[in-house]
A protein has these predicted regions:
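Amphipathic coiled-coil/heptad-repeat helices and related helical stalk/stem segments
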Residues: 38-39, 95, 144-145
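Extracellular/periplasmic juxtamembrane segments that couple receptor/chemosensory ectodomains to their
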Residues: 76-77, 115-116, 135-201
Length: 205
């Protein structure tokens, strides 16, 4: 996505965009008057920060027409002037599938939160982009879980425990430093320690 009139012949909104459609790579011209990308976060923020930037997930109406996150990388000319933003987009649905494919135990589930605590990945799809980990933590009335939620947003890593629907979970979390997000896996306490209990049981025989 180029700065206005960098190429005079292409006008103010030159932004060639390629995407995969099945087994075919298609290309379109994304920029236009009713889709002025120069004022969108994925363009403005890396330009202002003068550095690469991962956007918070958003619905890109008129562009990708899906919920996605964008990695933006500023491009400069020989004089050091920024002339364009190179982007790569990830479908949030696809990204969630990759995260959810990691299951240490049959009853495990994963979550991922954005910089402000909004769920980006959650086992309940209705919670994605509409609910925060803070709201969920308050519903449990579990002080340890509430403290863990704040630690995740601060970019810390660690382990916590919480109880939900009369089941005790262990909660392992770590930051994704390049994005400012945090990912966690929740595992049933009984699943984790069942193998330990089995070893103890056989050691007594």
């Amino acid at each position: 996505a180029f700065e206005p009139y960098y190429y005079e012949e292409f006008g103010a909104f030159y932004s060639p965009y390629s995407y995969k459609d099945g087994d075919t790579i298609r290309s379109i011209q994304l920029g236009r008057k009713d889709y002025d990308y120069h004022y969108m976060d994925w363009y403005q923020i890396p330009k202002l920060l003068d550095s690469p930037y991962w956007s918070e997930p958003y619905f890109d109406e008129g562009g990708g027409d899906m919920i996605m996150t964008t990695y933006s990388y500023p491009i400069y000319d020989q004089l050091g002037h920024m002339v364009a933003i190179f982007t790569a987009v990830l479908s949030l649905e696809w990204f969630a599938e990759q995260v959810n494919s990691i299951k240490p135990y049959p009853n495990s589930y994963n979550i991922m939160i954005g910089r402000g605590g909004t769920f980006l990945v959650h086992k309940t799809k209705e919670n994605i982009l509409t609910e925060t980990i803070f709201a969920t933590a308050r519903q449990t009335n579990d002080e340890e879980f509430i403290a863990t939620a704040h630690k995740m947003v601060k970019g810390e890593s660690g382990m916590g425990e919480f109880e939900r629907q009369n089941q005790r979970f262990c909660f392992f979390y770590a930051p994704i430093k390049s994005t400012g997000w945090s990912v966690a896996v929740a595992c049933l306490h009984s699943d984790i320690f069942s193998s330990v209990n089995n070893v103890r049981k056989y050691s007594y025989l």
